[in-house]
């Protein structure tokens, strides 16, 4: 059977007239109709669904792109808000630090002043006590010096001196 198919193919090749791409005869309009029918079938079966899928994909990409732009704008806005809040927080922290520092300095200076006053008053009190003790010691020593000098004179002179 394969021999018959090969022989038939050879005979049809030999029966063809030699010429160009196709012959201008009654088969030309049939080929045009076949081409149009093929184009209509391909259009209905292949191209329209393909174009529909491509359009849907384009819309999907565009919607995702628009959503991404919205998210990007929202992220930029949130970043701006965040930076503003951070700046405000830093300023507030700086003010609080400065206020606290000045309060601590004031507190320390008050405590130092109180301690200085207390030390001065204790020093003055101690000085007064020492002065009083010195005066008392001098008075007691003065009377003792008087008594001792009288005794020394009595022993040296051998006379009794009356205490005045």
From Swiss-Prot:
InterPro entries: ATP_synth_b, ATP_synth_b/b'su_bac/chlpt, ATP_synthase_B_chain. It is a single-pass membrane protein. It comes from Cyanophora paradoxa. F-type ATPases have 2 components, F(1) - the catalytic core - and F(0) - the membrane proton channel. F(1) has five subunits: alpha(3), beta(3), gamma(1), delta(1), epsilon(1). F(0) has four main subunits: a(1), b(1), b'(1) and c(10-14). The alpha and beta chains form an alternating ring which encloses part of the gamma chain. F(1) is attached to F(0) by a central stalk formed by the gamma and epsilon chains, while a peripheral stalk is formed by the delta, b and b' chains. Its main location: plastid. It is found in: Plastid, Cyanelle thylakoid membrane. Belongs to the ATPase B chain family. The chain crosses the membrane at residues 26-46. F(1)F(0) ATP synthase produces ATP from ADP in the presence of a proton or sodium gradient. F-type ATPases consist of two structural domains, F(1) containing the extramembraneous catalytic core and F(0) containing the membrane proton channel, linked together by a central stalk and a peripheral stalk. During catalysis, ATP synthesis in the catalytic domain of F(1) is coupled via a rotary mechanism of the central stalk subunits to proton translocation. Pfam families: ATP-synt_B (PF00430). GO terms for molecular function: proton-transporting ATP synthase activity, rotational mechanism; proton-transporting ATPase activity, rotational mechanism. Keywords: ATP synthesis, CF(0), Cyanelle, Hydrogen ion transport, Ion transport, Membrane, Plastid, Thylakoid, Transmembrane, Transmembrane helix, Transport. One of its GO terms (cellular component) is plasma membrane. This is ATP synthase B' chain, cyanelle.
């Amino acid at each position: 059977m394969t021999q018959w198919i090969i022989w038939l193919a050879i005979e049809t090749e030999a029966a063809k007239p030699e010429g160009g791409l196709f012959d201008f005869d009654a088969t030309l309009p049939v080929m045009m109709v076949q081409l149009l029918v093929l184009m209509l079938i391909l259009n209905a079966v292949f191209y329209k669904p393909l174009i529909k899928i491509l359009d849907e994909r384009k819309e999907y990409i565009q919607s995702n792109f628009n959503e991404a732009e919205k998210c990007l704008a929202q992220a930029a806005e949130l970043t701006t808000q965040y930076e503003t809040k951070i700046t405000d927080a830093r300023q507030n922290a700086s003010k609080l630090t400065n206020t606290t520092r000045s309060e601590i300095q004031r507190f320390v200076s008050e405590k130092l002043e109180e301690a200085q006053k207390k030390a001065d008053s204790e020093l003055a009190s101690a000085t007064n006590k020492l002065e009083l003790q010195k005066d008392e010691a001098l008075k007691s020593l003065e009377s003792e010096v008087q008594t001792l000098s009288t005794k020394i004179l009595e022993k040296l002179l051998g006379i009794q001196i009356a205490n005045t």
